[in-house]
């Protein structure tokens, strides 16, 4: 039974109402500093911890709760007579409920004007110590670190005569240990990111020790293959617009491959300003297009490779309306992603309950890092978020691209970034015409892209081509020109750039160098 609570919070969301409810249930309130003042100003009967321990706060508040009368009351096991006798001998009442959240260290170091001294002062000591004590003794003590749990605790207390059950206490304790681990991880990341100058402004993006924190969203039926187990975890600092923010409206449970492919589709479609559709198969775009609306964009994207689109993942950057839904519903699709679905569109898919509909709000946030596991280690890099500006483009051929060719080239370049290397993409009129992905030689990717267009009945005459990396020889260029391309965009940087440019002039096509490579593995 909860008779006495200690409350000390930095995030004061909902704390007055929670404390009032506790007081109404007859719980004695202990508190510190600003929290105690807030509760007292609200007319609640509260005892300052300094008055409770008989020892004043000291060292500018660094020492407030580090006292045997606090930790003894938290750590004592109620089932051990010797523990209870020790409390009685020293006049220490039990503390049955601890409500604590910590100094805002992460928010502090996120500020541009934060100094090392600011960061150090926002490293909480007493808070984590109390939290860990209470979480360790969770059989007897209820500990709350998240304001979202106030209502849960109150409801259980009201239903059980001020008692909280073991299952809830255990869940809350595990939440505490996760929270303090993340807190210490953030401190370690920060301190080990400082350079020799020990200045906040000169932090390295890659700390000497990297701590990552993720919460499990769900266990998955299996991994990439049925014999592999898997789970999906969400970054605690999920950026706006990221896949992990999805809301599933209908359909079967997402699989490992569904999630991986959905991320590829969503990241690609978000980059377009015009209404766009991206169709993904095995993490590669097999159709990308922009159009007047979602239905138009889908119709164009589907034309690229109808065979590969079967059972694919489809993403839109505009609402899916009834027209788009009816067009998509004619095909077998695993997952459909959009910022929103009209009521009429939802009705269309109501008859296809296996189709997974994911709603994700658009946003321009990105993960801080791109991560890849290797045997015994982790590769960490910044995101491939470089967008080439028009002023950075360099026409290196005698013939300049026309305005239409320039539009097609920029579209193709945007798509090529999301195709597995080696990547060759034919485009025209705001749609992909042929995609060659994941080949060990660039010339083979060029041939495959050409064959794909031919199989789909699409002409490549007058098309634009993007290559994610330079042409090492002229052979790849010769293939795309023979297929009908009249302009090419590529990074450049090959030892044989001069030969490739000369070949482009020989074919009387336009070529643009971006100076930026987009390998994707």
Curated annotation (Swiss-Prot):
**Keyword Transmembrane helix among record annotations:** no
Q: In which pathway does it act?
A: Purine metabolism; IMP biosynthesis via de novo pathway; 5-formamido-1-(5-phospho-D-ribosyl)imidazole-4-carboxamide from 5-amino-1-(5-phospho-D-ribosyl)imidazole-4-carboxamide (10-formyl THF route): step 1/1; Purine metabolism; IMP biosynthesis via de novo pathway; IMP from 5-formamido-1-(5-phospho-D-ribosyl)imidazole-4-carboxamide: step 1/1
Which reaction does this chain catalyze? (6R)-10-formyltetrahydrofolate + 5-amino-1-(5-phospho-beta-D-ribosyl)imidazole-4-carboxamide = 5-formamido-1-(5-phospho-D-ribosyl)imidazole-4-carboxamide + (6S)-5,6,7,8-tetrahydrofolate; IMP + H2O = 5-formamido-1-(5-phospho-D-ribosyl)imidazole-4-carboxamide
Note the superkingdom of the native organism: Bacteria
**Signal peptide start-end:** none
Q: Which GO terms describe its cellular component?
A: cytosol
Single GO biological process annotation from the record: 'de novo' IMP biosynthetic process
Keyword annotations for this protein, in alphabetical order, are: Hydrolase, Multifunctional enzyme, Purine biosynthesis, Transferase
Q: Which InterPro entries match?
A: AICAR_Tfase_dup_dom_sf, Cytidine_deaminase-like, MGS-like_dom, MGS-like_dom_sf, PurH-like
Q: Identify the EC number(s).
A: 2.1.2.3, 3.5.4.10
Any GO MF annotation of the entry: phosphoribosylaminoimidazolecarboxamide formyltransferase activity
Q: Please report which protein family the annotation says this sequence is part of.
A: Belongs to the PurH family.
Domain-level remarks:
The IMP cyclohydrolase activity resides in the N-terminal region.
Official protein name in the record: Bifunctional purine biosynthesis protein PurH
Query: What is the source species?
Result: Burkholderia lata (strain ATCC 17760 / DSM 23089 / LMG 22485 / NCIMB 9086 / R18194 / 383)
């Amino acid at each position: 039974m909860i008779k006495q609570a200690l409350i000390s919070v930095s995030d004061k969301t909902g704390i007055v109402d929670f404390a009032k409810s506790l007081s109404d249930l007859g719980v004695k309130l202990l508190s510190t500093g600003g929290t105690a003042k807030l509760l007292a100003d609200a007319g609640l009967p509260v005892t300052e911890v300094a008055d409770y321990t008989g020892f004043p706060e000291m060292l500018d508040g660094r020492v407030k709760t580090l006292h045997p009368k606090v930790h003894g009351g938290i750590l004592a096991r109620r089932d051990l007579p010797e523990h209870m006798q020790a409390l009685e001998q020293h006049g220490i009442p039990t503390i049955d409920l601890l409500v604590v959240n910590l100094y805002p260290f992460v928010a502090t170091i996120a500020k541009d004007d934060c100094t090392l001294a600011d960061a150090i002062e926002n490293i909480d000591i007493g808070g984590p110590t109390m939290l860990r004590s209470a979480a360790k003794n969770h059989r007897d003590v209820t500990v709350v670190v998240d304001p979202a749990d106030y209502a849960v605790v109150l409801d259980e207390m009201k239903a059980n005569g001020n008692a909280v059950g073991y299952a809830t206490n255990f869940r809350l304790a595990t939440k505490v240990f996760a929270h303090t681990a993340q807190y210490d991880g953030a401190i370690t990341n920060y301190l080990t990111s400082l350079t020799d100058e020990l200045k906040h402004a000169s932090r390295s993006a890659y700390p000497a020790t990297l701590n990552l924190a993720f919460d499990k969203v769900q266990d998955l039926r299996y991994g990439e293959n049925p014999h592999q187990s898997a789970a999906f975890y969400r970054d605690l600092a999920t950026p706006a617009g990221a896949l992990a923010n999805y809301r599933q409206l209908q359909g079967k449970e997402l699989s490992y491959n569904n999630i991986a492919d959905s991320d590829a589709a969503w990241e690609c479609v978000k980059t377009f300003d015009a209404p766009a559709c991206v169709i993904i198969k095995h993490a590669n775009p097999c159709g990308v297009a922009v159009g007047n609306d979602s239905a138009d964009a889908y119709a164009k994207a589907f034309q690229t490779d109808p065979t590969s689109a079967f059972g694919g993942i489809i993403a839109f950057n505009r609402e899916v309306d009834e027209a788009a839904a009816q067009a998509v519903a004619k095909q077998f699709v695993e997952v459909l992603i959009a910022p929103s679905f009209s009521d009429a569109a939802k009705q269309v898919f109501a008859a296809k309950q296996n189709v997974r509909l994911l709603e994700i709000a658009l946003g321009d946030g990105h993960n801080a890092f791109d991560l890849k596991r290797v045997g015994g280690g982790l590769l960490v890099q910044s995101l491939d978020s470089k967008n080439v500006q028009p002023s950075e483009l360099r026409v290196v051929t005698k013939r300049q691209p026309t305005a239409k060719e320039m539009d097609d080239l920029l579209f193709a370049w945007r798509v090529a970034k999301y195709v597995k290397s080696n990547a060759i993409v034919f485009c025209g009129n705001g749609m992909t015409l042929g995609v060659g992905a994941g080949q060990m030689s660039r010339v083979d990717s060029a041939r495959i892209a050409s064959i794909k267009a031919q199989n789909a009945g699409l002409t490549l005459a007058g098309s634009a081509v993007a290559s994610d990396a330079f042409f090492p020889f002229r052979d790849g260029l010769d293939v795309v020109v023979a297929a009908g391309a009249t302009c090419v965009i590529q990074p450049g940087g090959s030892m044989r750039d001069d030969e490739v440019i000369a070949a482009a002039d020989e074919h009387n096509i336009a070529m643009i160098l971006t100076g930026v490579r987009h390998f994707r593995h």
